[in-house]
């Protein structure tokens, strides 16, 4: 839809795309993978528990990042700002669907000016390129910075163009024994199921989720996978639906991609969708059937567990099935028509951060907690 007057004014004030790097004082993909991971360690983003999970696979993870860099800016771009004296800031953005991107791993060496630069440059690039349809960010609700920026996105953009959903993140062993139930029919997705999948996803996750995840247009992510194949990687999606009689009551959406694009392995998560009118007993039957099918998508997965994301109401059921609760996560999504508003929202937030930093009423490091 066309921008309103305020949004158009925001767009008109942006630099040309060719001038973006100089205008914001940023560089794109100029940092090496080793330097970037060193920055993650220095800023505490790779804290001990997270580093311990990555360490056994660090060589593979770094190689995956290098291949993503080899694709230019078609799969991954890392904005950096600042220098050794001022402190560096970085933001990574990777292509999660054919026309959607995930903002992640915002870090700063006590340089709020650099953090502002990389965030606004990323937002401006999305607007100026004009080819992207959605952006998203995953954050832990207890992390103050992302909770204040991304957690308030609906207030800034509106519920028709953005969403913020709370989820529980689990690890479930790939070898877990799951009960089967003849009363629940689980089927692999094909095009004939698209209406059921989109309807269920809209009821459980919202219309913004359906749009951003491109469920109506490319469930297996075929177009995206072609881009990843160019650098010897894969990005696919596998779906199963659960039916009670003829009605869809659940779905498992298994994302597969290069290990470690996200340090919580969200690029390889399994999203579990359960109809809201199910009893706890029915939830367990449906979840068991879906997970029993979805585990086959992880036959070649490097980890011994599957990253599992579900609504918080499913926690008792999944614990009963052998899943281990890891943490709470929020997924913030904003759509293309909301980009100018999200840009103003981030700009306004950082104006306050910088004002406080200048006055030294609080330390910038307290305001710039990394998105973990």
Regions found by a protein language model. Name each.
Residues 41-103, 205-270:
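A conserved beta-strand-loop-helix scaffold within acyl/acetyltransferase catalytic domains
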Residues 64, 77, 176-203, 207, ...:
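A cross-taxonomic marker for long C-terminal extensions/tails that follow the last structured domain
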Residues 156-174, 326-338:
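Conserved catalytic-core motifs of GNAT/GCN5-like acyltransferases
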Residues 11, 35-39, 125-142, 146-147, ...:
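Compact beta-rich and alpha/beta scaffold cores in large eukaryotic transport/transcription complexes
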Residues 328-372:
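C-terminal functional modules
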Residues 89, 94-161, 259-326:
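Acyl-donor binding region in acyl/amide transferases
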């Amino acid at each position: 839809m066309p921008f309103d007057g305020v949004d158009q004014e925001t767009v008109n004030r942006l630099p040309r795309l060719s001038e973006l790097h100089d205008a914001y004082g940023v560089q794109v993909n100029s940092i090496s993978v080793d330097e970037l991971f060193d920055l993650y360690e220095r800023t505490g983003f790779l804290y001990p528990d997270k580093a311990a999970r990555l360490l056994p696979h660090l060589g593979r993870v770094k190689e995956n990042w290098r291949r993503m860099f080899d694709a230019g800016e078609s799969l991954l771009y890392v904005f950096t700002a600042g220098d050794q004296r001022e402190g560096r800031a970085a933001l990574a953005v990777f292509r999660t669907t054919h026309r959607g991107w995930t903002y992640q791993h915002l870090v700063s060496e006590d340089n709020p000016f650099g953090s502002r630069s990389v965030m606004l440059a990323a937002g401006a690039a999305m607007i100026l390129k004009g080819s992207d349809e959605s952006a998203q960010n995953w954050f832990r609700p207890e992390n103050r910075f992302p909770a204040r920026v991304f957690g308030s996105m609906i207030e800034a953009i509106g519920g028709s163009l953005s969403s913020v959903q709370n989820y529980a993140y689990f690890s479930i062993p790939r070898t877990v024994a799951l009960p089967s139930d003849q009363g629940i029919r689980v089927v692999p997705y094909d095009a004939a199921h698209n209406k059921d999948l989109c309807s269920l996803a809209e009821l459980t996750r919202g219309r913004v989720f359906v749009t951003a995840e491109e469920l109506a247009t490319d469930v297996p992510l075929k177009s995206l996978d072609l881009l990843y194949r160019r650098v010897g990687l894969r990005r696919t999606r596998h779906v199963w639906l659960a039916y009670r009689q003829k009605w869809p009551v659940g779905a498992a959406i298994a994302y597969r991609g290069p290990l470690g694009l996200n340090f919580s392995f969200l690029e390889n998560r399994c999203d579990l969708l359960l109809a809201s009118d199910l009893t706890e007993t029915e939830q367990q039957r449906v979840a068991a059937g879906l997970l029993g099918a979805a585990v086959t998508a992880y036959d070649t997965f490097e980890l011994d567990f599957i990253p599992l994301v579900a609504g918080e109401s499913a926690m008792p059921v999944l614990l009963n099935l052998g899943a281990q609760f890891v943490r709470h996560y929020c997924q913030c999504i904003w759509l293309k028509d909301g980009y100018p508003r999200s840009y103003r929202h981030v700009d306004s937030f950082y104006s306050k951060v910088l004002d406080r930093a200048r006055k030294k009423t609080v330390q910038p490091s307290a305001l710039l907690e990394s998105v973990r």
